[in-house]
Amino acid sequence: MFSAAISVFVLATLTAATPMARGIVPAPPAGQCNVGTQQCCNTVQDASSDPAAGILALLGINVQDVTGQVGLTCNPITVIGGVNSNCDASPVCCENNSFGSLISLGCVPVSL
C-alpha cells in the first residue's frame, strides 16, 4: 500500500514539473474546440494571402508567426439556441480571438 502511494506521489510530481512554454496555447485538434473559442468567419484564408497579410501587417504581426489559417470578420458561436448559434459561413476554432471581429488567428475548421 505504501509503495502504491509513493508511486502516485512521484507520478503527480513529475507531471506537475513537466516544462511548458509560457504564453503558447496549443491549437486544439481539428474538429475539437471549446465552445468559447468557436467562431463563425465570413472567410478563412492562409495567413500569407493578400487580405490576411495586409491586416496582419497593420496589426504588427509577422505572417511567419501565424500557425493555422486566419479567419476574417468573425463572430463567436454561442450556445445552442442562442442568437449566434448557427453559422452560414465558415465555422472554425481559433487560438487567438483577441482582435475583436476583425481577425482570428490559428483557425482550424469545426463541424457544428
Swiss-Prot record:
Residues 1-17 form the signal peptide. InterPro entries: Hydrophobin. Glycans are attached at N96. It is found in: Secreted; Secreted, Cell wall. Disulfide bonds join C33-C93, C40-C87, C41-C74, C94-C107. It comes from the Eukaryota. Keywords: Cell wall, Disulfide bond, Glycoprotein, Secreted, Signal. One of its GO terms (cellular component) is extracellular region. GO terms for molecular function: structural constituent of cell wall. Pfam families: Hydrophobin. Induction: A CT-rich motif, which is often found immediately upstream of the transcription start point of highly expressed filamentous fungal genes, is present at the expected position. One additional CT-rich region is also found upstream of the TATA box in the promoter region. Aerial growth, conidiation, and dispersal of filamentous fungi in the environment rely upon a capability of their secreting small amphipathic proteins called hydrophobins (HPBs) with low sequence identity. Class I can self-assemble into an outermost layer of rodlet bundles on aerial cell surfaces, conferring cellular hydrophobicity that supports fungal growth, development and dispersal; whereas Class II form highly ordered films at water-air interfaces through intermolecular interactions but contribute nothing to the rodlet structure. Self-assembles to form functional amyloid fibrils called rodlets. Self-assembly into fibrillar rodlets occurs spontaneously at hydrophobic:hydrophilic interfaces and the rodlets further associate laterally to form amphipathic monolayers. Belongs to the fungal hydrophobin family. This is Class I hydrophobin 6.
